[in-house]
């Protein structure tokens, strides 16, 4: 499960979505 997917489950953490999406992209690129 991706970090972004976990955040999508909680609307209270909307501000973290862009950050975690970026982290997911970085991890995928490794």
UniProtKB/Swiss-Prot annotation:
It comes from Litoria rothii. The keyword Membrane does not apply. GO terms for biological process: defense response. GO terms for cellular component: extracellular region. Keywords: Amidation, Amphibian defense peptide, Secreted. Its main location: secreted. The modification Leucine amide is found at residue 30. Belongs to the frog skin active peptide (FSAP) family. Rothein subfamily. It is found in: Secreted. This is Rothein 3.1. Expressed by the skin dorsal glands. Lacks antimicrobial activity. Does not inhibit the formation of NO by neuronal nitric oxide.
